[in-house]
């Protein structure tokens, strides 16, 4: 679900203080975008939203969430309706819970 090697790599690249800011910004922006996913939007907007979410997720190691976003992005690109937008939200919530729980342990070590 989470690529911890990517998380560690990013934290080492930017430092602990900046990493905390990046995590806070990521969670806020992604949560907001996920909450506004709507199957009634034009496919081009859904594709754009899922592309943004995928890229953001990959930067912070949310691989399962990113993979689901990628699946939806491809469907939207090819004119297919992606009916799993609820799964995208669920995947984000599950990933977020795991990430925050494990991150506390990782930082404490």
Listing of model-derived features with the role each one plays in the protein:
Residues 1-48, 52-109:
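Two-component system phosphorelay core
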